[in-house]
């Protein structure tokens, strides 16, 4: 089975690629990423030895998807994950729309063309900005980390997902 992951070098995309290859035999993974986020190049280097083909591209451009090989399944993990994107002057609402919604049209066209199934992932955009900005954070180098005494009794954190690849030297 061939799996195509958008945003393959991001936090979620790279973790999914690694997990799929570890948990199931007979799966090949390839993905596309615009490599704009911090850590993308690091994740690209970690995916290469696993056999993941990483293609530098942007799913907002239909032409970048047209040249990709067919897949049986698509996992759409590409998004602008910033909760504050388009709010408080952190980028425009149009840019947010293009990254998180308009690009989905191109992914759907790819799925239709190749008769591929689609797993559409959500982003932190579904959470209330007021509640997210009230979470206690600690500064960790050049990143933020949720304070261990935070208010999340359930859910998944980055620390749980990054088994061998910590994002922050504090872990």
Residue ranges and their predicted role:
Residues 1-171:
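N-terminal Rossmann-like NAD(P)+-binding domain of SDR-like oxidoreductases, especially those catalyzing
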């Amino acid at each position: 089975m061939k799996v195509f992951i958008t945003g393959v070098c991001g936090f979620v995309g790279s973790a999914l690629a690694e997990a799929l290859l570890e948990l199931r035999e007979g799966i090949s993974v390839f993905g596309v990423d615009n490599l704009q986020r911090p850590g993308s190049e690091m994740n690209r280097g970690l995916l290469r030895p696993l056999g993941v083909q990483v293609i530098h591209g942007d799913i907002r451009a239909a032409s970048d998807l047209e040249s990709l090989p067919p897949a049986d399944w698509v996992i759409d993990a590409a998004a602008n994950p910033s909760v504050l994107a388009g709010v408080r002057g952190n980028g425009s609402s149009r840019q947010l729309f293009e990254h998180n919604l308009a690009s989905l049209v191109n992914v759907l066209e790819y799925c239709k063309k190749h008769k591929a199934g689609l797993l559409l992932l959500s982003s932190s955009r579904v959470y209330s900005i007021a509640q997210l900005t009230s979470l206690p954070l600690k500064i960790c180098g050049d990143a933020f980390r949720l304070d261990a005494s935070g208010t999340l009794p359930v859910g998944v954190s980055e620390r749980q997902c990054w088994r061998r690849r910590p994002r922050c030297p504090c872990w």
